[in-house]
């Protein structure tokens, strides 16, 4: 097989100066967007009670638990800034992504215990379903890091009702366990 690739004709043509310049401009635009996203993720990481308050209670934040649990450098967050209901914190309180734990890939989901003690809030069921869908599609184990005070009671009608409510999350979890 190596000989085939050594003798193979080059594919395509060299990029023109205009294409190279366009590529550089696109990269610069993407870097600006990434800076904006990174700043928003950092803002969400700092929402809620000060980290020291959690430490004084003997707790770790969800971000610290993820860092402790996963193999270094493997956590790839997915929906940290997803907020379909415009929650006052600017997030659904869900931290999720792909990660490796002891060399095995998994889908990881946790609740931000710095904001309302990790309570379920509006928009969270949709985020949870996105995560369980990914685990199902990729045939990966789903790891929950739950430190949750329950449901924000004035918003419970937004949590359980309809086909994409939190009840569906429980059903999906039962499916994944089979």
Cite the ranges covered by each PLM segment.
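Terminal-region recognition feature
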Residues: 1-178
């Amino acid at each position: 097989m190596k000989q085939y690739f050594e003798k193979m004709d080059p594919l395509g043509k060299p990029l023109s100066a205009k294409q190279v310049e366009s590529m550089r401009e696109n990269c610069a635009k993407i870097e600006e967007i990434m800076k904006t996203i990174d700043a928003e993720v950092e803002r969400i990481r700092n929402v809620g009670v000060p980290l020291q308050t959690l430490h004084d209670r003997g707790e770790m934040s969800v971000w610290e638990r993820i860092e402790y649990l996963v193999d270094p450098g493997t956590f790839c967050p997915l929906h940290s800034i997803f907020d379909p209901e415009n929650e006052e914190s600017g997030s659904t309180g869900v931290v999720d992504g792909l990660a490796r734990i002891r060399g095995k890939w998994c889908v990881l989901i946790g609740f931000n215990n710095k904001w309302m003690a990790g309570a379920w809030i509006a928009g969270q069921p949709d985020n949870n379903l996105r995560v369980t869908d990914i685990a199902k599609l990729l045939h990966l184990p789903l790891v929950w890091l739950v430190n949750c005070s329950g449901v924000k009671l004035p918003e419970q009608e937004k949590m359980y009702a309809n086909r994409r409510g939190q009840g569906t999350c429980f059903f999906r979890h039962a499916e994944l366990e089979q």
